[in-house]
Amino acid sequence: MSETIPKKPLKKGSLVFVDKNIYDKSIEALASDSDLPAYIFEGPGEILGIKEEYAQVRWRRPVPDVWFKLDQLKEYLASE
């Protein structure tokens, strides 16, 4: 029997990156600069807080924190 591993919900402290395909199709993409930095799609960013369906993400760079919809974020898995 092969059971699927349940997906962990994102929470405060989770390491994430932005899913480019989902973000590009969102209403937020229409309201933002089309030339976004590559690091948001590469990760990792850390979730600082969650309010309803949005997460505040801090990148490991000297840039401001950013709010993204939770469905646009994916868990960052470090390469071994």
Swiss-Prot record:
This is NAD(P)H-quinone oxidoreductase subunit O. NDH-1 can be composed of about 15 different subunits; different subcomplexes with different compositions have been identified which probably have different functions. The gene is ndhO. It is a peripheral membrane protein. Signal peptide: none annotated. One of its GO terms (cellular component) is plasma membrane-derived thylakoid membrane. It comes from Prochlorococcus marinus (strain MIT 9515). Its EC number is 7.1.1.-. Belongs to the complex I NdhO subunit family. NDH-1 shuttles electrons from an unknown electron donor, via FMN and iron-sulfur (Fe-S) centers, to quinones in the respiratory and/or the photosynthetic chain. The immediate electron acceptor for the enzyme in this species is believed to be plastoquinone. Couples the redox reaction to proton translocation, and thus conserves the redox energy in a proton gradient. Cyanobacterial NDH-1 also plays a role in inorganic carbon-concentration.
